[in-house]
């Protein structure tokens, strides 16, 4: 599950893309409950029937909106991971992109809704959702392999460690987006930073990091 929503910086020329951008903006500004085909039509100057022509169902609209937003964030993630800085610094950047900004983060709100609807989805839809998850997983695995090969990280099974790390991020991220009392983003970042230090690095950095608040 990815991080906070970011507005696209390029001009949107295709009608389908305009609808997806408008859907994400509606979720960010008004919440998922206010997202309707008729409302989107008014935003982009189309009839609800025209929008149904592109998407068919609201479930499909939500999934395509999620895919579109992940394309935007994926470009940002790849840019962050290609920087010429230590692997640990790039790992922190990936974590920052992954986590929600906080309560009711629109991208995470959309993720949770798509996850919930996937309980009754067909196999093809679930595969499309899995592809979004695996994009993060592959980038995390590649970064771990690089860090181990350069001696920046302890030797770990990159696939297993990436799976466990994403589960940790998903758990903390869910706490943040639902507004679990006593949970804030900086506290979560400290918890995750301690886990990564203890698991991947040795030496004074891990020992010197102040403990996370309970």
Residue ranges and their predicted role:
Residues 125-130, 134, 148-196, 203-214:
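Hydrophobic/aromatic-rich alpha-helical bundle segments in the mid-to-C-terminal region
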Residues 15-18, 22-60, 64:
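Helix-turn-helix
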Residues 67-73:
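Short, basic, alpha-helical segments at the C-terminal edge of helix-turn-helix-like DNA-binding modules
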Residues 74-75, 79, 104-112, 123-149, ...:
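Amphipathic alpha-helical packing segments from all-alpha helical-bundle domains
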Residues 64, 78-108, 161-165, 189, ...:
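Hydrophobic alpha-helical connector segments
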Residues 29-33, 84, 150:
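Short coil/turn segments at alpha/beta junctions that flank glycine-rich nucleotide-binding fingerprints
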């Amino acid at each position: 599950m990815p991080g906070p929503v970011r507005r696209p910086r390029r001009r949107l020329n295709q009608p389908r893309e305009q609808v997806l951008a408008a859907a994400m903006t509606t979720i960010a500004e008004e919440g998922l409950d206010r997202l309707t085909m008729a409302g989107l039509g008014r935003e982009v100057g189309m009839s609800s029937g025209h929008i149904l022509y592109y998407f068919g169902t609201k479930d499909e609209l939500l999934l395509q909106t999620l895919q579109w937003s992940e394309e935007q964030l994926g470009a940002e993630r790849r840019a962050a991971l290609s920087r010429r800085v230590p692997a640990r610094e790039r790992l922190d950047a990936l974590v920052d992109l992954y986590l929600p900004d906080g309560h009711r983060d629109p991208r995470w709100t959309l993720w949770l809704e798509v996850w919930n609807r996937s309980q009754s989805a067909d196999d093809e839809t679930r595969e499309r959702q899995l592809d979004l998850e695996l994009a993060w997983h592959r980038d995390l695995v590649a970064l771990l392999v690089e860090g181990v090969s350069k001696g920046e990280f302890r030797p770990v099974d990159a696939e297993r460690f990436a799976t466990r790390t994403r589960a940790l991020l998903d758990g903390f991220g869910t706490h943040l987006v639902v507004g679990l009392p006593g949970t804030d983003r900086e506290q979560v970042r400290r918890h995750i930073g301690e886990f990564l230090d203890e698991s991947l690095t040795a030496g004074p950095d891990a020992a010197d990091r102040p403990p996370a608040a309970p």
